[in-house]
Amino acid sequence: SSAASDVYKRQDMGNVSDKDETKEDIKNAAENPEYIADETAVITEGLSIKGDLDSLGSIDLFGSVEGNVTCRGKLTVSGSITGSSKANEFFANDAQVDGDIEAKGAVKIGQGTVVVGNITATSAVIGGAVKGDIDVHGPVIIDSSAIISGDIKSKSVQINNGATIDGRCSQCYADVNMESIFDIKGKKNK
């Protein structure tokens, strides 16, 4: 029974530590808006939340949320969200998202995912279906399984064979001065 009591003590000590870490996370978050807690909240498949969901860390969402979801870490979705999502990174696989997605870093929309809303990020890989505009200040990769109904603004775009896009693609964030390249009259006068 000594081993069982050791396990209990370790679990109990872990809980105390977790509470201390949570208090520390709240303090750090108040002092630094960029702080990301080293924890992941899990919303299980059978759980449904009506209302906004906020986390200082990451969220793994297998259930459903009717409300806005905000987390400072990575938001991984295999369930459904009806509302906007803001995260450091956003990953969705076999998910349903009805609302805008905003990420400071990468957005990955996996095959089997349907998004009805705009996407804003630093980079994006799209393998699912998106009905909305995609605004990415870095690279965008459109996989062969992707279906997009909306405009894409990015620094660069890679469209794999088989992808379906109904919209415009613009590399408006690229480091290319289009006017100087196509200024034929100005080049002749020099």
Residue ranges and their predicted role:
Residues 1-8:
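Short, small-residue-biased leader/transition segments that mark boundaries at the very start
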Residues 4, 24-25, 188-189:
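Intrinsic disorder/low-complexity segments enriched in polar/small residues
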Residues 40, 46, 50-52, 56-58, ...:
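Detector for repetitive beta-architecture
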Residues 5, 14, 156, 160-175:
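Intrinsically disordered, low-complexity glycine/proline-rich and charged
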Residues 166-190:
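C-terminal segments of enzyme domains that contribute to small-molecule binding surfaces
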Residues 18-47, 53:
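N-terminal domain-start segments of secreted/luminal proteins
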